[in-house]
Structure formats: C-alpha cells, structure tokens
Amino acid sequence: MVLLGDIHGDFQEIYYFSKRNETQEPINLIQVGDFGAGFRSSFIDDMEYLNTELAYNNVTLYAIRGNHDDPKFFNGDYNWSNIKLLPDYTVLEIEGKRILLVGGAISIDRLQRTENVS
C-alpha cells in the first residue's frame, strides 16, 4: 500500500510509478486529497488512459477528495476498473485493514484557479 497526496493533476507521476511495478504484484495506491479531479477539461480522457495503464501494471488507485478537487467527481458515478474516486467518509477495506477516508473541505480559492495551471 502506497499513500500519496497533492498531485494536483500531475497524473504522469502515477503513470510512471505504475510502470515500475516489475513484479506485477498487486499494488494499491491511496491518493489522500488534491488529486486534481475536474480542473482540466480532459479529466475523463486522462482517467481513461491512466486506468488502462494501471490495469496493465496491476495497480489500483483509490482517491479521496481534497479541497482542490471538484466534489461532483466523488459522488460514486466516476469509477473505472483500477481508479476509484471515493465519496467522503468512506471506510476502505484493503490489505486486511480498515481505513477511514474523510475527504476535504471546499476550496476558498477554487474560482481563482486556472485550468492546466493551478
């Protein structure tokens, strides 16, 4: 299990990490907020591509909303085989553990952010 946070839409880091899974043992990534959901108009396409790569490399990504994520992507409607965008207050049962994932607050600077920049 690997925890990461605050990637703010830099999905290439996850892609490169998954490519390094040479053993093909299952790896679970837990993104603990500020994933970057909804800031780029290409977000859905980015997830489709990333999901294909994660599946190929036997990596599953679980993401909880941060204050710099669009909450609408974490309502349970947006999930892929290897990417799970989890609702606030999810109890994730993984690798024999139960983890409470709370989710972030509403970002006070969301309207000032610029697509593909911040």
Locations of regions flagged by a protein language model:
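Conserved P-loop NTPase mechanochemical-coupling segment
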Residues: 1
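Core catalytic region of metal-dependent phosphoesterases/phosphodiesterases
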Residues: 4, 9-94
